[in-house]
Amino acid sequence: MLKFQEESLRQSVNGALALRHQINPFLDAIFEKGITNVCFLGIGGTYASAMQTVSHMKEFTSMEVFAENAAEYITTGNRRIMDGTLLIYSSVTGSTPEIVKAVEKAHAAHATILAFLDNPNPHLRELCELCISYPQNEQLKLFMVADRILFLRHEFDCYDDCYENFDCYLADALISVEQSLDSFAQEFAKK
């Protein structure tokens, strides 16, 4: 396998899972304080990840949960983003103009902001109640937030078992999948 680093992938996934020690206390406190709705903000690929996370949550919850495209939000606004909104976003660069402007706008609307920044941006960090810098695993980070919210609302009762299994097996399962697809990928590339 070209450029495949098994131990690096294992450490990356397990490191992302360990972020729950930062995420969960924050969400527990926000939930106790009360949130009206949950918004996952993104642009391009991060918007696609936001939509996946919202689809997952909608399967379990009656709470208002939505994905917001950063470019649309800075252009047209969204009155649902306000005090009581938990806004979550992920950014690889931390410098995408639409994300920066959208986060500024959400901050001005008094939304509570949780950010995952692969490369920490000091300006964005100032606008967030919690900013976690950890590279890669965007979907996993967003799903950990979603699942914790569902758990706190008593809508995801298997949360503890699920994450106990993820802690034990997810990294190795993802490595196994990647290894098992290598021969398929080689054959596909020849065609």
PLM ranges: what are they?
Residues 131-144, 175-191:
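Short, intrinsically disordered, charge-balanced linker/junction segments flanking boundaries
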Residues 15-34, 176-190:
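A short, well-structured juxtamembrane/interface segment
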Residues 1-18:
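N-terminal amphipathic/basic leader segments beginning at the initiator methionine
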Residues 31-167, 171:
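Glycine-rich phosphate-binding loops that contact phosphosugars or nucleotide phosphates
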